[in-house]
């Protein structure tokens, strides 16, 4: 698989959804072979409003005296949301509940860096 989206889906079947929000441009990708517990409209607003706000707040706190911010994981009722700050925005990956997104974090970050998706605010 040649694209970063395909590579993320190839990591584990537990990756259900991938979104890139960069410089005001949003691209959302759903694994084609599964249903999603959320609507694409709510996902759209999550990527535009919720995830940037979470990263801003956690990043500001992380930069005070915590050594920065690497990523955030949110545990919703039906899935986990892994949010990685990236230049000009973020990458968001939904994992099924069968996965532990923290256990996948290093693999995800390495993959993103291999595709030159660079972190923002990491110290």
Question: Where are each of the predicted segments found?
Answer:
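Non-catalytic interaction/Regulatory regions outside core domains
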Residues: 1-123
């Amino acid at each position: 698989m040649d694209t970063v989206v395909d590579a993320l889906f190839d990591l584990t079947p537990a990756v259900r959804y991938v979104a890139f929000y960069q410089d005001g441009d949003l691209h959302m990708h759903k694994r084609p072979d599964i249903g999603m517990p959320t609507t694409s409209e709510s996902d759209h607003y999550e990527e535009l409003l919720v995830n940037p706000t979470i990263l801003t707040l956690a990043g500001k706190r992380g930069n005070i005296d915590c050594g920065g911010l690497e990523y955030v994981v949110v545990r919703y009722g039906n899935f986990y949301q892994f949010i990685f700050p990236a230049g000009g925005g973020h990458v968001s990956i939904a994992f099924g509940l069968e996965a532990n997104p923290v256990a996948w974090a290093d693999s995800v970050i390495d993959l993103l860096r291999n595709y030159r998706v660079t972190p923002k605010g990491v110290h």
